[in-house]
Amino acid sequence: LVITSIALYFTYFIHGIGASIMGQYKPELAAHWGAKALSDGTMDVSMVVSVIAALGLGRLISLPFSGPLSDKFGRRLSGIIGVICYAAYFMGIAFAPSMGVAYAFAIVGGIANSFLDTCVSPTCMEIYVNNPSVANLFTKFSMCISQFLLPFLIGFVAAANMSYRTIFIVAGAAIFIDGILILFLPFPERNTAGTVKKEKLKITPAALAAILIGFTSSSTFMLWLNCNQELGKLYNLSDPSKIQSFYAVGTFAAILCSSVFIKKGLKEINILIIYPLISFIMLGLCYFIQNPTICLIGGFVIGFAGAGGVLQLAVSTTAEFFPENKGTATSLVMIASSIANYTILSLAGYITKVGGSSAPRMILLLNMAVTFIGILLALFVKMNRGKEA
């Protein structure tokens, strides 16, 4: 089963690349899809931002089915669907002749993402029964490793004069091979749908708040992840792609710390209050202190507090409300997360269009507002959880 969990975590390693690679290759993709150059000579990358947002749309379309499907027909099927869709996404984006085709493949990528979510999270929580929160954090850990390595891979590909498509193709092939393994590896035994009496999902206010943290926590890091490069340029940072590596190191550190904190007995819900609070303060600092170093510090801190598994802990916290329907609980939080991905990034794309050079700072304010709402939600869950459990 350990091998199974490694094969599953590997899909997230590739997913880490899939989730952030379009953001790193915005100008190349935009040029390939026939974007116009802006007045200052840079490419108009707003169409790429829209395509990235379509990943959220794809997740949204498929999540209502993927959770129940995984709970009912088994995790393996869900994983295989995810892998096939992911391989299609990488190849599709790499060779898409136009934005329209890319948009369609991004939706397929989103579908892949949601089937992996409802396969990997519940399976790893079932393999490591004693530490489900920690098992779930490791999905994030795998993504983190690949997002940390991605800037180096991009540099390597560029140095070797290979096409920007190289990483897409390699990643697509790798996840396909991994899928073949998943097809044959053993999965944990589960009490099948027959024995469990169908519990009707009761969504209490606190459970709803826990689900909505999926929205706010995703917005915090999505906005940062997709808009930090522009902020770095605005603050005259010499190499804005460094922010990405600082961010990954922060996430890395947070996952290890959170795992230790949880083992030591810190409640997940407290992390859901403390981390967003740290993000909120950091975003404020990035807004008021306009110098290049703050972007790197911000990258690390947002990586730590924004992306360091808050979303995964929201999943574990929500799963406590629905012990019999972990797959469905996962998809509820991820639905909230995808709505965030789609709406907030579409809004960010719009701000980027109308805001001109001050757009990156306007996006920081948007991010602060959403993050603040997340803190309030977590406080609400903390106060009401005991009454309902």
Descriptions of predicted regions:
Residues 22-23, 203-253:
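Extracytoplasmic gate region of multi-pass secondary transporters
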Residues 105-141:
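Cytoplasmic helix-loop-helix junction between adjacent transmembrane helices
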Residues 77-91, 270-285:
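Structural signature of the two symmetry-related core transmembrane helices
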Residues 61-74, 254-267, 352:
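Helix-to-loop junctions at the C-terminal end of transmembrane segments
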Residues 115-128, 308-322:
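Intracellular juxtamembrane helix-capping segments at the cytosolic ends
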Residues 130-131, 135-186:
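Helix-loop-helix hairpin linking two adjacent transmembrane segments in secondary transporters
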Residues 61-97:
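Conserved MFS/SLC helix-loop-helix module at the cytosolic interface between two early adjacent transmembrane helices
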Residues 3-35, 63, 222-229, 344:
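Extracytoplasmic
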